[in-house]
Amino acid sequence: MSGSLDSAVSLVAGWIDEGVIPGAALLVSRGDDVLVERYWGVADMSRKVPATPNTLWSIASITKPVTAAAFMACVDRGLLSLDAPLSGVLPEFTGDRGERPWRRDVTPRHLLTHTSGLAGFSRDNLAMRKRHAPVDDFIASFMDEDVHFQPGRWHLYSSVGLGLIAECVGRSAGGGKGRPMDAYWRFALDLLRDLGVNDAFFLPDDDQQQHIAWVESTGQEGLDWEIGNSKYFRSLGFPWGGLYVRARDVLTFVSAFLPGKESEALSAAARKAMITQNAAPPDAPASVAPTQRDVTWDPTRPPRARVPWGLGWEVRGGEASDYMGDQSHATVFGHYGASGSIAWADPEEGLAAVLLTNRAWQSWWPVHERRTARLANEIMAALD
């Protein structure tokens, strides 16, 4: 990189100084070289714990590409298929409920591209959280969720879909024995270790929880089911948003999908498929499942004409992005998490960037003043 990344570092430092975010980690790499690894502020405001390389961050929905990678590893092994009917693996997901034949048409590819017609969360999402339901109850509820439109027609971001993907992994990798979610957790964590990720936890123990950054501005403060922070939430291991990871390991994971990286755990074909545009339909109209949308959905924003996705990863595809910048290549892929986490990479430049914070996205700090897009612009401007 011929330019300096000092301006990108200064941008994040300024957000800390201004009180925009309590703590942050910024990492940038190119090829095998880590160009920036900086930590600022506090990981836990109440305990005055500083953010350090040992901090475990709630990466929220960046968990989804991990689940997608686990599914693709099963495809590599001949256990699962992208385009077979979902009901072939999950027979509970059968029959139509006044939905025409839509349910029978849903495939794992639809789930991985958020084009299945399933809503963001189940109808019973809050009720289950309030009664401290186990993760298995969430998965069971997903089997009965409505398919709101013909699969492939529109984009509707769906945690339900990735929960079903994880269930497919658990049933296939577990050989039909034992609890599928246990098999999913083992398989996904083994895959991460094979990719070089050493400190990632679905079910952090008491010692590990001492290192977790406390997420501010969740909108659920003080509730015993608060996202990211509550003892209950940390016991769920949600495959769509429940991982706690050190920042360097997030960088390792996203970098694993760049060309030239070696992996025996996940084939080059699988990794390429995940970061290649598989679908780019328009957003579903705001009238579709408005009460079951993701917490970062903004109903005041007009629907997008194209929403490009790979398999588990969002692909910029030349469209505007809140976090992948204004001048990055169309092939850039990434994901963000509601906890205030961002990871993206540019295959053409061999570049990867990770910003982890502990202020929730739904406070809208990343999109105010286009903060995270500006950060990506600063990073891209430093390229040769």
Q: Where in this protein do the model-derived segments appear?
A:
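Short loop/turn microsegments at loop-to-beta-strand junctions
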Residues: 22-24, 35, 331, 339-342
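Short, surface-exposed loop or secondary-structure junction motifs
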Residues: 40, 44, 97-330
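Short, conserved catalytic-motif segment at the N-terminal edge
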Residues: 2-59, 95-96, 228, 364-365, ...
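Hydrophobic (often cysteine-bearing) scaffold residues that line and stabilize catalytic clefts
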Residues: 4, 8, 59, 63, ...
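Residue-level signal for well-ordered, solvent-exposed loop/turn and beta-edge residues enriched
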Residues: 33-34, 79, 351
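Short active-site loop at a secondary-structure junction
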Residues: 17-27, 46-110, 148-160, 238-241
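Short, positively charged
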Residues: 1-14, 320-326, 379-384
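Structured C-terminal helix/loop/strand segments within mature extracytoplasmic catalytic/sensor domains
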Residues: 334-384
